[in-house]
UniProtKB/Swiss-Prot annotation:
Signal peptide, first to last residue: none
Designated name of the protein: tRNA 2-selenouridine synthase
GO BP term (any one): tRNA wobble uridine modification
UniProt-listed Enzyme Commission number(s): 2.9.1.3
GO molecular function: transferase activity, transferring alkyl or aryl (other than methyl) groups; tRNA 2-selenouridine synthase activity
Subunit structure, as described in the record: Monomer.
Domain of life: Bacteria
Class of this enzyme: transferase
Keyword terms: Selenium, Transferase
Reactions this protein catalyses: 5-methylaminomethyl-2-thiouridine(34) in tRNA + selenophosphate + (2E)-geranyl diphosphate + H2O + H(+) = 5-methylaminomethyl-2-selenouridine(34) in tRNA + (2E)-thiogeraniol + phosphate + diphosphate; 5-methylaminomethyl-2-thiouridine(34) in tRNA + (2E)-geranyl diphosphate = 5-methylaminomethyl-S-(2E)-geranyl-thiouridine(34) in tRNA + diphosphate; 5-methylaminomethyl-S-(2E)-geranyl-thiouridine(34) in tRNA + selenophosphate + H(+) = 5-methylaminomethyl-2-(Se-phospho)selenouridine(34) in tRNA + (2E)-thiogeraniol; 5-methylaminomethyl-2-(Se-phospho)selenouridine(34) in tRNA + H2O = 5-methylaminomethyl-2-selenouridine(34) in tRNA + phosphate
Active site annotation, chain numbering: 97
Amino acid sequence: MSQLPLTSDLARIFLDDVPLIDLRAPIEFKEGAFPCSTSLPLMTDDERAQVGTCFKQRGQAAAIELGHQLVGGAVRAERLDGWLAQLRKQPDALLYCFRGGLRSQTVQLWLHEAGVTRPRVAGGYKEMRRFLIDTLDKAAAECHWTVLTGMTGSGKTHMLEHVTQAVDLEGHAHHRGSSFGQLPGGQPSNINFENKLAIELLKRRHQGEHAFVVEDESRLIGRCCLPNPLFDAMCEAPLVVVDVPQSERAEQIRQDYVHDLWLRYQAMFGAEEGWPLFAAYLTDALARLKRRLGDQAHRELDQLMQIALAEQANSGTTERHLAWITLLLTRYYDPMYLYQLGNKRERIVFRGEKQACLDFFAEQHAARQQG
């Protein structure tokens, strides 16, 4: 078994999107894995738990023996068929378990005996995860970061689509970063969020990029937490402020969080099932702000929202939503933003309308390319 191939070129695995077969238990895969990995576990969650208990009570030899009993005979044959089928689809796939130990060694040997020899990843999941954490830490420390900020509804996410050096943190988190930021389909685990972000930065730095623009975010984007080194770098980074009138921002919010999001719910769940989910999404998002708004303001906003939802349900129009959106900006989001910006004015390097900010980013990018 010791003569079967190992690979430790972790950078190449992620730069080339090498397919991976994850041999850990399903519960381990759910907590975090890698974008190009497929879960084909050696043991189920229950089998793994039994082996773990045996190890604690009777030691390693007994645990290994139990593992072979649980995954033997027809069970072994069935799982071997699954690994072989996957390797027929992805013949260059690599094998890994948690530490690159017995589980991946066992499967590698069984595959070898079946006539297929594939490398396993030295150090397994733990080593690959450490590599990606280090990648994030180095990017935070070594790259030049600029933060795009602006009042709620300024369309910052849309602006970044036109910025060459942009990194879409909210895209990786599958969340728009506010009380109303939840998207249908849920969020990735925090580990998966970090892994995808690290792989993007690894690839882009490998191509020679070292300056990035991100949207102003709190530490939490929904349930996804920004890595401490990256968040710290963002808190010290130069700021570009985009100025957009409130009426335009209210319209942008109506478009993004009402019109477009309803279409996403409708596409995912159908109109009949999707409507109550969409209405609950808006109502619940506002309810999460109740403590900060106060009871009276929350009641007023909720009444306006329910009127708008009723009209949307009856006629399909969404213009009534502008009433509660504008009031929420006036009462909550705009004052909060102005207070926060007042604490970091010394970091502002540019301020202007959307196109002026986009031109600034383009000029910065061109200057770095020439330099």
